[in-house]
Amino acid sequence: MSTESMIRDVELAEEPLPKKAGGPPGSRRCFCLSLFSFLLVAGATTLFCLLHFGVIGPQREELPNGLQLISPLAQTVKSSSRTPSDKPVAHVVANPEAEGQLQWLSRRANALLANGVELTDNQLIVPSDGLYLIYSQVLFKGQGCPSTHVLLTHTISRFAVSYQTKVNLLSAIKSPCQRETPEGTEAKPWYEPIYLGGVFQLEKGDRLSAEINLPNYLDFAESGQVYFGIIAL
């Protein structure tokens, strides 16, 4: 190889290589748009999550003196609970001064007749059709057991306007004495309460009565022991 050829090769090797031409301008623009779209979607998603979970957003107004906001539903329930009930109701008590009979009174403490219920001839008069809770309690008391068997009965009856017949709705029988008190032994007192209660469909004008068979055994020592009532449901 000649000297001139070697010199030419060295000069060619020292020349810098040509730079690669850059990518087209359109590819850079697409990359920028993609990056911007990603950031926009990510930001919107983050904002939605923060609003959804209550991290940011309108804050509840604090009321003075520790008062709390009440929803319209709660206000409706609260106001309706204060509205006086227009359903028929009655609660009568026994007259402790009536000897030998069970007489009901409505003008005594803890007794009432409301919204159309009447007490006539010792019976409660139903003012309107519907379901009613009927209840009654009596308390019997005795001293010792006689030779004859003692059976105590308590009955709630209905005289319906539709068939003009007296029908027993509720009834119970109890026997306080299992055997006669032997002669010469101390006669111990006994007590027998009877409670009756049930729900019935009644008609306007029906008459309800609560009766017993042996009123002489009734105990009137304390108030609230003998009563009779109805409540419209």
Swiss-Prot record:
Disulfide bonds join C145-C177. SUPFAM superfamilies: TNF-like. GO terms for molecular function: cytokine activity; death receptor agonist activity; identical protein binding; protease binding; transcription cis-regulatory region binding; tumor necrosis factor receptor binding. GO terms for cellular component: external side of plasma membrane; extracellular space; membrane raft; phagocytic cup; recycling endosome. Belongs to the tumor necrosis factor family. Homotrimer. Interacts with SPPL2B. Cytokine that binds to TNFRSF1A/TNFR1 and TNFRSF1B/TNFBR. It is mainly secreted by macrophages and can induce cell death of certain tumor cell lines. It is potent pyrogen causing fever by direct action or by stimulation of interleukin-1 secretion and is implicated in the induction of cachexia, Under certain conditions it can stimulate cell proliferation and induce cell differentiation. Induces insulin resistance in adipocytes via inhibition of insulin-induced IRS1 tyrosine phosphorylation and insulin-induced glucose uptake. This is Tumor necrosis factor. It comes from Canis lupus familiaris (Dog).
